[in-house]
Amino acid sequence: MAALRRFLWPPPRLSPALAPQQPFLSPWGRPAGTAPGMSGRPFSCREEDEGAVAEAAWRRRRWGELSIAAAAGGGLVGLVCYQLYGDPRADPSELAAPELEDPPRGRGLLPIPVAAAKETVATGRAITEDLDLYATSRERRFRLFASIECEGQLFMTPYDFILAVTTDEPKFAKTWKSLSKQELSQMLSETPPVWKGSSKLFRNLKERGVISYTEYLFLLCILTKPHAGFRIAFNMFDTDGNEMVDKKEFLVLQEIFRKKNEKRETKGDEEKRAMLRLQLYGYHSPTNSVLKTDAGELVSRSYWDTLRRSTSQALFSDLAERADDITSLVADTTLLVHFFGKKGKAELNFEDFYRFMDNLQTEVLEIEFLSYSNGMNTISEEDFAHILLRYTNVENTSVFLENVRYSISEEKGITFDEFRSFFQFLNNLEDFAIALNMYNFASRSIGQDEFKRAVYVATGLKLSPHLVNTVFKIFDVDKDDQLSYKEFIGIMKDRLHRGFRGYKTVQKYPTFKSCLKKELHSR
C-alpha cells in the first residue's frame, strides 16, 4: 500500500535552490542535465556514465514500485469483490442453507447441521410438490401463503391472509415456522375480544395470530357477500335458535365448509390425501361427506348456498351428534379466541358478528385503496381501473386503461367512500345481474341512468354520477356509451371472487414433475 501511495502521490522534490548539485529531471523524472540557471559545468563522459547507471537504477526502482502497486491493487479489488459477492466457487445451495436452519424464536434449540437441513428441505419440497397434485386451487393457495406449522397442521397468520387476498403470490418462498402448543397459546393470549374489534384488527395483529384452513374458507365467503346476507349466515350458525352462537355451533358449520370443499378422491391417492388433510385440518378426518344426495353424488352448491338454503339445516344432524369430538380435535385459533374468549365459554351475538364481517370487508378494501392512494384522499380513475381488472381473466388490459386515459380529460379522483360503495355493489352482483339480464332480453344495452337505477333497485345503494361515468369509460370498449352483459358482468364476476375460482399455481414445472413421478410409479 505504501508503494501504491508513492506511485499515486510522489513526495515533493527539493527545489533547485536547495539542491544545486542534483541533475535536472525531465517531466517523466529522468535525469536531463543541469537545471537552467544552476551553477556548474556541463556533464563530462564520466558523468554521462554515472547518469546512465542512475537512469537504469531509476528504471528498476520504478518498475519495482509499479509491480508492488499492481499487486496491492489486485489484492484490494479481490478483497472488495469477496466482501460484496462472497466466494464465487461456493455452491448456492450451501450458501442458502444457514437461512433454513434458524430455530423458532423463543426456543433454545441447537442449530441444525447443514447437511441435515439440506436433506430435510429437499424432502419437504418433494412432499409439497406431490401434495399439490392432489389439492384443490384453494388448498394450494392456502398452503402457498401459510407460514406456521403446529403439530403437523398449517396455519396462516393475519398478515398471511391479507397477502393472500390482496396479492397474486408471495414475494418470497415461504418456510413453515414450527410452533409448540405452549408457543401457540402464548401467541393467542394477545388476541383482543370481539367487542374490541376494528377495521384494523388483522393489520394490528400482523403475525401474532393463526388462521386455520376452514376459517380461511369462511373469511373468503365473508369478503364476497352482501350485508343483507349476514343475518342469514348468523342464523345458520345459531342451530338452537337462541339468537346466540357458541363455540360448538361455530365449529359445526366450519365442518360443513370443510366437507363442501373436499375434493373427490381417486383410486390410489388415499395416502396423499390423508397427509393433505392432516396439514389442513390437523387430524385425519373421515372422507364421507354429508353434502351428498341419495344417489351419492356431490351437491353442486357454493358456500353461500350452503348457508342460505333452509334445507341445509338437515346437514347439521350428523355433525351435531359429534360436536364434542370436533371441538376436542380442533386447535384454538385467533378467530375462536376473538369470538368466544380464551376459555371458549363466551357466546357471540348478531351485532358483534355483523360488526366483525363489516370490519373485515372494510379492512381489505382500505389496504387495496391505500396501496394506490400514496397518502392522498383519492386514487386516480386509471388506478381504479387497475384495481378492478386485477384478478380478472382479461388478457389485454391496456385497452381498458386507454379508455380511461383518453376518455376522462380532467382527473377528479375516486374517494374511498365511492370505492367502498362500488365493492358493496359487487357483493350484490347476482341480484344486479338479474336486473341487467332483463335489459338484454329486450335486446337493449344499458345507459348510465338505467345502470344507476338498476343498482339502486337491486342493492339499495346509490352510486355517484362520477363513479358510474368512470365505470362506463372503463368497460365501454365499442365507444357507444352503453354497457352490456358481456362488457361488464362477466369480468366483474372474476373480480368479485379475487381470482379464486380459476386460481392456478404458477409452479408449472414442479406440478409436471409430480405428475410424471406419479405416472412412473404406477407402471
UniProtKB/Swiss-Prot annotation:
SUPFAM superfamilies: EF-hand. Keywords: Calcium, Disulfide bond, Membrane, Metal-binding, Mitochondrion, Mitochondrion inner membrane, Repeat, Transit peptide. Residues 226-261, 395-430, 464-499 form the EF-hand domain. Residues 1-6 form a transit peptide. It comes from Mus musculus. This is Calcium uptake protein 3, mitochondrial. The keyword DNA damage does not apply. It is found in: Mitochondrion intermembrane space; Mitochondrion inner membrane.
